[in-house]
Amino acid sequence: MAYFVYCIECEDGSIYTGITTDVARRFEEHAMGKGGHYTRAHKVKRVVHAESRTTRSEALKREAEIKSWKKEKKLVFISASRARHKKGVK
């Protein structure tokens, strides 16, 4: 089973990072107020990044890495990731 590390942009401009096995389902849970405490307080806007990992352990390590970054680094990472995705490069 694949695990995904995802980043959601919230309406206040903040970035929430989490892991799941189903990004679309998890986003809907956040949008309905059934996600984490953070997204109950910060309304979600859109998924801005998702990447897969083979194991839950790998996903948790990557989630922790991204969460440790300052907002500016997250925004640069997301922008570069989206640019690569548009070009079809992973």
What do these predicted ranges mean?
Residues 1-40, 44-53, 57-77, 81-90:
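GIY-YIG nuclease catalytic motif and its immediate N-terminal context
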